[in-house]
Amino acid sequence: MDCDIASYHVDSFDFLVSKGCQFAAQAVPAEKFRLKNGDAVTMKFTSAQLHKPTLDTGAKLTSDTLPLLPAECRQRGLTYAGNLKVGIDVHVNGSRLDIIEIILGKVPIMLRSEGCHLRGMSRKELVVAGEEPIEKGGYFIVNGSEKVIRLLIANRRNFPIAIIRKTFKEKGKLFSEFGVMMRSVKENHTAVMMTLHYLDTGTMQLALQFRREIFYVPLMYIVKALTDKNDAVISAGFKRGRNQDQFYSSCILNMLAQCQEEEILNQEAAIRAIGSRFRVAVSDRVAPWEDDLEAGRFIIRECVLIHLDSDEEKFHTLAYMTQKLIALVKGECAPETPDNPQFQEASVSGHILLLILRERMENIIGMVRRKLEYMSSRKDFILTSAAILKALGNHTGGEITRGMAYFLATGNLVTRVGLALQQESGFSVIAERINQLRFVSHFRAIHRGAFFMEMRTTDVRKLRPEAWGFICPVHTPDGAPCGLLNHVTASCRIVTDLSDNSNVPSLLAELGMYTHKTVALAPPGEELYPVLMNGRFLGYVPITKAASIERYLRCAKVAKDARIPYTSEIALVRRSTDIKNIQTQYPGIYILSDAGRLIRPVRNLAMDAVEHIGTFEQVYLSVVLDPEEAEPGVTMHQELHPSCLFSFAGNLIPFPDHNQSPRNVYQCQMGKQTMGTAVHAWHSRADNKMYRLQFPQQPMLKLEAYEKYEMDEYPLGTNACVAVISYTGYDMEDAMTINKASYQRGFAHGTVIKVERINLVTERERKTIFYRNPREEIKTVGPDGLPIPGRRYFLDEVYYVTFNMETGDFRTHKFHYAEPAYCGLVRIVEQGEGDSGAKHALIQWRIERNPIIGDKFASRHGQKGINSFLWPVESLPFSETGMVPDIIFNPHGFPSRMTIGMMIESMAGKAAATHGENYDASPFVFNEDNTAINHFGELLTKAGYNYYGNETFYSGVDGRQMEMQIFFGIVYYQRLRHMIADKFQVRATGPIDPITHQPVKGRKKGGGIRFGEMERDAIIAHGTSFVLQDRLLNCSDRDVAYACRRCGSLLSVLMSSRAGSHLLKKKRKDDEPLDYTETQRCRTCDKDDQVFLLQVPRVFRYLTAELAAMNVKIKLGIEHPSKVTGS
């Protein structure tokens, strides 16, 4: 498949294997603690290496270790994971004790990555290994299931975003709605959020995040902790570029004065003040023998602009953020929003796993610390390598193995620190293989986050102009996730590796940039633009040179100059010169080359070469579709293809530019629900349920993307002759009629393939194997006790037999599917080491699914319909040439849907069939001067057909010619997986709920159909109220109960005898006989003359009892029976 559908997933995991594991080991803070005997111990990871998956035979890793392939994991239900080997450096009292190397656990391996055995295999080798010939990888195998981590949208890293947010006022007293937010990210992808808040007093507070807690620190505390310079130098550094702004100058002086009042006079005092306030929060990260100075340094290092290494760089970047915040407060720059793709990036699977791995390693070393502290309480304890290995134990390895597998299996993130991600669930999903389009779309999906699903605002769902070329405008669900679950375009890719930008500062200095040390040499009064590179404030450039510097950098980037990464973004944001003072972004030159950015290729017209641009710089570029639209001196870029705005699925819609937009949205969803050829390696898969179209065809109309993606290897539909005519009456309301003869010849014939996993190892009788009693003949079971391949099985037929080797008993198991099924492949797989006999079987069932009434079909234009009738061929209309349509389509489906693309496809399909060619249906090929209708109409004329695709038809009933011409052509139809056999629900009798006495819900339980308010209203509107009473009461949960008319209670009536009541209430004469007749008596009123038998629903009695338990009484208004009957 000539499309990098999952390249960024694989590249990100390659980063994890090659560099990430080592980064994670180095990023884990050293554990410093003191044992009971007084020894000071320091433990730290020094190295980490990820190995390829191997068979777990208990042997050490050697060159002879057997490799574990993905196909084996799918069938055996295993996790495709490799061993993580780490080195732990241990120091005692400042002297090195040892460097311990140990396998810490297993980490799931992404297919086709550097850690996978499939890497580098040819197509033939992939087929031999049980994989698809075009396998691209990008997913994991966990417990036999394929899992993919979806792309997650995050704030752009290392970029200060100016925000106006009303909720900022709720942060504390005197807080305003203005702030500058930055998501600071290290090279190892460790991230922290920090926000600079503006207070109504003119001062500023810096919000720091540590382990999900937010701490507010005065800005100047942090600034003075970063530098040992005096207040005058600090003030000059912060005011550089805004010396004439008296308001800003007063703000800086006020904050410095506050520091004087708090006696924060130098760098050490500032660090100590910060350390004393954070000492409790970082107690497990600072050794007991270290003072507040070390705690303060830890906060500066791990919570403040962590992507910068030196304090001087942090000082200058904070100065930039302060100036940007003041510009926002004064209305000099436009506010920004994290909902804009310009300020977003994608968190890729490898980077997310790296963060989880780092935290798991941090948890392990903390567990070892606590174990050693416990072990040191014994008198004879001596800290040795053996003691550390014992402390590591088996439970620490499960932290990695089980933790990583749990994350991928459930998609839930269990974390203490939060990892600067806005959600804790929904990270991974099952990579469903309903068809190839569905499978591929998982890798191209990009999600905003589960947190935003609950928000009422629609801002996060909007399709913004900045998303052009990066986010597909039509490939998004039409339900609740609309606008939140998007898909990147086919040409979009994501930067996953770290770019070398170390030469950029020197290059900028050569081009005329003033560094912070040389800016004092700038001529007085010269206007300057700040230069920011990946959140690092490099210096200033004169406004007069800014444009020429930006052009030079772009030329160097396109020419792939080694000094600047070719995937970097270069943007010049100019000051607003508009007369109406329309605000722009904060001006400056921005160079962005971090990982996680979305980039796409365009053509640079000046250099006639392909250039990759990003979401930030695209806003300030002029990109045209047609060279004739180029504006001299302004336009420098052109799109490579007009369809660059569509995703993988969007590029497979024929003539999408002729359809209404919602129809393209529907097709993107329905294309992923189509029965087709999902895989070719059926023999090596163990999916619970898969769909297969038995006789698929390639479409008569193809797109450029169709050939590029090799979709003919996995076709999705059938070419059908479609007549647009109101003929049968069964084609109303989106229904369609199928030719019964076409159905009988296999039109849209499909099968459902299920794999049943029978694992005897999990049963209580571990001595059980598959085996049939040789003395007993069972025709439905083979000698090995397993079903016979190729045989058709029906409900309650015996399909496998087990034998208990301890008791000698045979046990038969009956077929439990309601539909008959053919037994396909029967496989015996190993469960693990030491298996004795056949215990784990995979049985493949093939269920035939011919199109029947109620099955769903759709064209490639979002025109979905239900098969309403299989019409006999002798009664269908036929053309002059004897052609009988396969499908009757109602003409009323066109006007409201405006799917002109389907009409063009009908004409073009007929022309393609008559000329024996495949025609191009790519978008934007035709225009107003060269229309598609005219092009294909002329082709039809050459073939002897009507220009508009109309034909003369004859009635199939009486053979008379129809007065009107019928629009007739070939359309590629898809059969969707929504089949009536999976959904129909009808019953006469069945199980009922023991409490409500109503039918249980659920199709699998044999429950009743759902009946709601709309159905009730429909029956009332038909004037059939008695049917309503009969169905919903008499035949559902009708019940009888006694109620007291006097007090209206349904619960106070109890059965009692007159004799007992007489003895309690009054004295009885000696000769008076006892009356033992039982009667219904109201316990509240103590009378029985107003107790009547009522007919009520059982669920009403249950509701009354439930409300009574909550001390709520229901009082009924009951008429006397004489009034009801009229007597």
UniProtKB/Swiss-Prot annotation:
Pfam families: RNA_pol_Rpa2_4, RNA_pol_Rpb2_1, RNA_pol_Rpb2_2, RNA_pol_Rpb2_3, RNA_pol_Rpb2_6, RNA_pol_Rpb2_7. Its main location: nucleus. Gene3D superfamilies: 2.40.50.150, 3.90.1100.10, DNA-directed RNA polymerase, subunit 2, domain 6, RNA polymerase alpha subunit dimerisation domain, RNA polymerase Rpb2, domain 2. Its EC number is 2.7.7.6. It is found in: Nucleus; Nucleus, Nucleolus. CDD domains: RNA_pol_B_RPB2 (cd00653). InterPro entries: DNA-dir_RNA_pol_su2 (IPR015712), DNA-dir_RNAP_su2_dom (IPR007120), DNA-dir_RNAP_su2_hyb_sf (IPR037033), RNA_pol_bsu_CS (IPR007121), RNA_pol_bsu_protrusion (IPR007644), RNA_pol_Rpb2_2 (IPR007642), RNA_pol_Rpb2_2_sf (IPR037034), RNA_pol_Rpb2_3 (IPR007645). Antisense ribosomal siRNAs silence rRNA expression during the elongation phase by decreasing rpoa-2 occupancy downstream of the RNAi-targeted region in nrde-2-dependent manner. Keywords: DNA-directed RNA polymerase, Nucleotidyltransferase, Nucleus, Phosphoprotein, Transcription, Transferase. It catalyses: RNA(n) + a ribonucleoside 5'-triphosphate = RNA(n+1) + diphosphate. Disruption phenotype: RNAi-mediated knockdown causes sterility. The modification Phosphoserine is found at residue 1025. The keyword Transferase applies. One of its GO terms (molecular function) is DNA-directed RNA polymerase activity. Belongs to the RNA polymerase beta chain family. Component of the RNA polymerase I (Pol I) complex consisting of at least 13 subunits. This is DNA-directed RNA polymerase I subunit RPA2 homolog. It comes from Caenorhabditis elegans. The gene is rpoa-2.
